[in-house]
């Protein structure tokens, strides 16, 4: 049986990935596998710039709306789901098109997963209790003692990752930094062609981000977050779903911690920082072809032709 093939289209947020993916779908019988850690959540449509109903009707999309905002999704589960979907899509005679910008998931898919333990509910509850009693700063100082390398890499207010790093240490007796340094060789069970949209004009990307954020507000983003607070009362500012860019800033605004203008400025700034991190990841990622989404169009046309050649069409 031939080895399955998959074409990956990567790029920063607001960089034209969805538009190009739909153009590819006009040319090839593809099914899209979302590479976006925010799109997995139901009831979070506006702030995640989720593909519209008409776009999802035009071409099948996978790994969208698969969990509630109070549930969790991981890189390990993405690798499992994506690998399975590549096989299923290929068996249907279609071409898998992986589209998104969650580079941690892509790295896990292409380079393999570290041998980290699964989350432990009892230990996590104990860490949460310590945070409530002594504060997040106490947990961060503890991490500095047992895993200074990871502590240096994390921000002191990164509650989720600080908790996870301590969890790994307490479960294994070894710091997370040691686990990450012992990654085993990884062989993909499919052929992969990796393309990326990398804008040369960063000012244009920043402008797109601001325009899209304001459009989200017009579409009812604040109301969407208000609905999340009502429908899922266990959500907090530290919940993984609310850590999605824009949602944390909206949450703070609804808590009364910021005014509307500050919320907008912080939301746009956070999205631009996300794009910067994504571009940093992309510079370290082996790429088969690159296009500028803001060029005259011929650059993106080359990516479409590259996809056709890769799939032998």
From Swiss-Prot:
Substrate binds at residues 13-18. Its EC number is 2.5.1.75. ATP binds at residues 11-18. It catalyses: adenosine(37) in tRNA + dimethylallyl diphosphate = N(6)-dimethylallyladenosine(37) in tRNA + diphosphate. Transmembrane segments: none annotated. SUPFAM superfamilies: P-loop containing nucleoside triphosphate hydrolases. Belongs to the IPP transferase family. HAMAP family: IPP_trans (MF_00185). Monomer. This is tRNA dimethylallyltransferase. It comes from Neisseria meningitidis serogroup A / serotype 4A (strain DSM 15465 / Z2491).
């Amino acid at each position: 049986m031939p080895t399955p093939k998959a074409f990956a289209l990567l790029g920063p947020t607001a960089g034209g990935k969805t538009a190009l993916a739909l153009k590819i779908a006009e040319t090839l019988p593809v099914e899209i596998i979302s590479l976006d850690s925010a799109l997995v959540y139901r009831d979070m449509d506006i702030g995640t710039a989720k593909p519209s109903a008409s776009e999802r009707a035009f071409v099948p999309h996978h790994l969208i709306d698969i969990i509630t905002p109070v549930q969790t999704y991981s890189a390990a589960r993405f690798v499992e789901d994506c690998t399975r979907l590549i096989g299923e899509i290929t068996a249907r005679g279609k071409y898998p098109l992986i589209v998104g910008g969650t580079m941690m998931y892509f790295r896990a898919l292409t380079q393999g997963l570290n041998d980290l333990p699964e989350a432990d509910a009892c230990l996590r509850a104990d860490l949460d209790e310590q945070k409530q009693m002594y504060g997040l700063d106490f947990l961060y100082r503890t991490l500095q003692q047992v895993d200074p390398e990871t502590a240096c890499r994390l921000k002191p207010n990164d509650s989720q990752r600080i908790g996870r790093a301590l969890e790994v240490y307490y479960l294994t007796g070894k710091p997370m930094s040691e686990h990450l340094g012992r990654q085993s060789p990884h062989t993909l069970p499919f052929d992969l062609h990796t393309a990326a949209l990398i804008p040369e004009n960063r000012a244009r990307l920043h402008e797109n981000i601001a325009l899209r954020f304001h459009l989200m507000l017009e579409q009812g983003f604040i109301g969407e977050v208000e609905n999340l607070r009502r429908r899922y009362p266990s959500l907090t500012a530290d919940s993984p779903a609310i850590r999605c860019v824009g949602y944390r800033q909206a949450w703070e605004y609804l808590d009364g911690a910021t005014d509307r203008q500050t919320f907008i400025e912080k939301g746009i700034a956070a999205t631009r920082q996300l794009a910067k991190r994504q571009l940093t990841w992309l510079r370290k990622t082996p790429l088969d072809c690159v296009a500028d989404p803001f060029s005259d169009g011929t650059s993106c046309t080359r990516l479409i032709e590259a996809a056709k050649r890769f799939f032998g069409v």
